Amino acid sequence: MRVVFFGTPQFAVPTLQQLLDAPDVEVMAVVSQPDRRRGRGNQVSASPVKALAIAYDLPVWQPERLRRDPEVLSQLQQTQADAFVVVAYGQLLPAEVLAMPRLGCINVHGSLLPAYRGAAPIQWSLINGDRETGIVTMQMDVGMDTGPMLLRWTTPIALDDNSQTLGDRLATAGAELLLQTLRQLDQGHLTAISQNEAEATYARLLQKEDFQLSWDQSALELHNRIRGLYPGASLPVQGDRLKVLASLPLGLGLLLSAAYADWQDWQPDPAAQPGTVLAIAKSLGPIVATREGALLLLQVQPAGRKPLSGWDWANGLRLQEGLSLLE
């Protein structure tokens, strides 16, 4: 089976690798977003998908706007591919591209469609505190994630999952599901199912202000946002912003893992002002009052420094019970 792969970020890499490893698949070319400034050094660099393609000596095409690039459109047509596989590419495919391959254009999407159509499904499933998510393969149409669905895979979302751990799990599962989808399509064994438009929701692009959290939010809301926005969510501390990389909501009756059993029934002082240190959990970190419940800071990253445990951070600042982090 001849395929062209469209993808850009790390999330798409396992699917491309799965196709490269499959004995019955020939990857003809890769289409990825143009090189951008990335990482801490803000240097222009190739996307993770392009880097893998280059390692396998595959042709890589990087149109700024696919629909306005006649050369790439012509090259796609000339591949005579059986299918175009699309994973987090970053551009909508025009109708003329969707019509090119024999089996159509197959997309791997990181949610249980029609929920969370759009650019950030993994992040919003965590932010909203969902307990289950998954992967769907679908036959693409001209809309954004609106095409008929083919196969799906589900997974529970754990309380300590974040966008990286959940994204890695979904990426691995999506790679396997995509290969199953292609093989079953090629054999004529799959029937596409239309999405229910009445159940559609959207996962909008994240904005800078989404990452600016406040102690006036509830502990559960803060925890979910810290997980979904990993590793970028921050809270105000002593006139600066502190990135919080891992946390645990306490005092809300949630079932905690065995590692935190000592804090299962702990309750915060309901009169404490949000941002007040309520306790220092030994070997773990500070417990801070919020609008509802309290938040245990397990891993943090002060501005300009490397990540460290909440325990080490609290000891370094000599935090004490009753101290307000807002002062």
UniProtKB/Swiss-Prot annotation:
Protein origin, superkingdom: Bacteria
Keyword Membrane attached: no
GO cellular component, one term: cytosol
GO molecular function, one term: methionyl-tRNA formyltransferase activity
Keywords: Protein biosynthesis, Transferase
Binding site for (6S)-5,6,7,8-tetrahydrofolate: 111-114
Keyword Nucleotide-binding: no
Reactions the enzyme catalyzes: L-methionyl-tRNA(fMet) + (6R)-10-formyltetrahydrofolate = N-formyl-L-methionyl-tRNA(fMet) + (6S)-5,6,7,8-tetrahydrofolate + H(+)
InterPro entries: Fmt (IPR005794), Formyl_trans_C (IPR005793), Formyl_transf_N (IPR002376), Formyl_transf_N_sf (IPR036477), Formyl_transferase-like_C_sf (IPR011034), Met-tRNA-FMT_C (IPR044135), Met-tRNA-FMT_N (IPR041711)
Known function: Attaches a formyl group to the free amino group of methionyl-tRNA(fMet). The formyl group appears to play a dual role in the initiator identity of N-formylmethionyl-tRNA by promoting its recognition by IF2 and preventing the misappropriation of this tRNA by the elongation apparatus.
HAMAP family reported for this sequence: Formyl_trans
Descriptive protein name: Methionyl-tRNA formyltransferase
Organism listed in the record: Synechococcus elongatus (strain ATCC 33912 / PCC 7942 / FACHB-805) (Anacystis nidulans R2)
